[in-house]
Amino acid sequence: MIDNWVILAIRFYQRYISPLLGRHCRFYPTCSQYALEAITKYGLLRGGLLATRRLLHCHPWDAGGYDPVP
């Protein structure tokens, strides 16, 4: 149930907030898409941990690149 609310929040961000900020994600898929896929595949706890780990790598000193959900 709460998974659905988190997924809706991510989709809201992708649709309405992200376009205003521009494309700055250094990873593919984007961090928000990665979070969406991870939570859908593994549930809120494990998927949320994967998404958090990914967000911690999203900074100018990380090379970025292709990083799919395991």
Curated annotation (Swiss-Prot):
Sorted UniProt keywords: Cell membrane, Membrane
Recorded family membership: Belongs to the UPF0161 family.
InterPro entries associated with the record: Membr_insert_effic_factor_YidD
Keyword Hydrolase: no
Protein name: Putative membrane protein insertion efficiency factor
Described function: Could be involved in insertion of integral membrane proteins into the membrane.
Keyword Cell division recorded: no
Membrane topology label: Peripheral membrane protein
UniProt subcellular location: Cell membrane
SMART domains given in the database record: Haemolytic (SM01234)
Cellular component GO terms, alphabetical: plasma membrane
